[in-house]
Swiss-Prot record:
The lineage of its organism: Eukaryota, Viridiplantae, Streptophyta, Embryophyta, Tracheophyta. Its main location: nucleus. Residues 203-212 have a biased composition (Basic residues). Residues 1-76, 178-225 are annotated as: Disordered. GO terms for molecular function: kinase activity. GO terms for biological process: response to oxidative stress; response to zinc ion. This is Protein OXIDATIVE STRESS 3 LIKE 1. It is found in: Nucleus. The keyword Nucleus applies.
C-alpha cells in the first residue's frame, strides 16, 4: 500500500481518480500465497471448508449413535430373526405365534399325532350349519342324477311306447269294423247265400276305394312301415297315415255313422 500512496502523491491532480485505480499495481503471487488470511477470507473457500467439517462431524456422530443388536449368534431360526429385525410392535403382536418356521410346524404336527386325541384336534369342528349344508348338497346331487336322462335310451323307450299305443288304437278300430261287418252278415236272410259269399270282395273293393280318397303316405312312413302296411291291408287295417278329424268318417264309416258323422 505504500507504493500505491507514493504513486498517487507523485501524480498530477488533474488526472481523474479512475486512472489512479486503473493503473494501481496488483499484488504479486508471492504476497497472496504468504498471506493466509486472504485465502481464509474468501467466501467460497470458507463455505467449502465449513461443509467438509460439518460432514466429518456428522459421520463421527452417526458412528457414535449406531445401534448394534445384542444378539451375536447365527440367524437360523425365526425367533432369532424376530429379535434382531426392527419390526413394529403392532405387527409383531398381530403375527405373534403365526409366522413361524416350518421346523416348528413339523414338530407340532408330530407331537399332535403322537398324542391320544390327535384326530379330534386335527379334525374340523362341525356345527349344525355345516351339517345342514352337506345334507342339502348330497340331496341336490341325488335329485339331479334321478331326473337327468341318460343318452338315447329314454328317447327310444318313448318312441316304442307311442308306437305301441298307436298300434293298440288301430287294432281296436279294426275290431269294431270287423264286429259290425259280421253282425250285418248275420242279419241277412238265409236265402241270399250268393250275396254273403260275395261280401268279402265287396268289402275289399270298398276298402280300396276309401284308400284312394285318403291323402298320400309320407315317404318315411312308406319305407319304415311298408311291411306292416301290407300285412294290415289284408286284415282290413288302415295304412299308417297322419289323420285328422275330417278323415275319420272316411276311414271308419260304420263307427262315424254310429257316432253321428256324415260322409263328406
Amino acid at each position: 500500500m505504500d507504493c500505491v500512496e507514493s504513486y498517487l502523491s507523485g501524480d498530477n491532480s488533474d488526472e481523474s481518480p479512475v486512472m489512479h485505480t486503473w493503473f494501481s499495481p496488483s499484488p504479486s503471487p508471492s504476497d497472496s500465497s504468504s498471506s493466509p488470511s486472504s485465502s481464509a477470507s474468501s467466501s467460497i473457500g470458507r463455505n467449502s471448508d465449513d461443509g467438509e467439517k460439518s460432514s466429518e462431524d456428522g459421520g463421527d456422530d452417526a458412528g457414535e449413535n449406531e445401534v448394534e443388536s445384542p444378539y451375536k449368534g447365527p440367524l437360523e431360526m425365526m425367533e432369532s430373526l424376530e429379535q434382531v429385525l426392527p419390526v413394529r410392535k403392532g405387527i409383531s403382536k398381530y403375527y405373534s405365534g403365526k409366522s413361524k418356521s416350518f421346523t416348528n410346524l413339523t414338530a407340532e404336527a408330530a407331537s399332535a399325532l403322537t398324542s391320544s386325541s390327535s384326530m379330534k384336534d386335527l379334525a374340523k369342528p362341525e356345527n349344525p350349519y355345516s351339517r345342514r349344508r352337506r345334507n342339502l348338497l348330497c340331496h341336490q346331487i341325488w335329485e339331479n342324477n334321478k331326473t337327468t336322462p341318460r343318452g338315447g335310451i329314454s328317447k327310444k323307450h318313448v318312441m316304442s311306447s307311442s308306437r305301441s299305443a298307436l298300434t293298440l288304437a288301430m287294432a281296436v278300430a279294426a275290431g269294431v269294423m270287423t264286429g259290425e261287418g259280421s253282425s250285418s252278415g248275420g242279419d241277412s236272410s238265409p236265402g241270399s247265400s250268393p250275396t254273403t259269399s260275395g261280401s268279402p270282395p265287396r268289402q275289399l273293393h270298398h276298402h280300396q276305394h276309401q284308400m284312394k280318397k285318403l291323402p298320400p303316405l309320407y315317404p318315411r312312413s312308406q319305407g319304415s312301415f311298408g311291411n306292416l302296411t301290407s300285412s294290415q291291408s289284408s286284415l282290413g287295417f288302415c295304412a299308417w297315415r297322419s289323420f285328422s278329424v275330417a278323415d275319420f268318417p272316411r276311414c271308419f264309416p260304420a263307427t262315424a255313422s254310429g257316432i253321428g258323422f256324415n260322409d263328406s
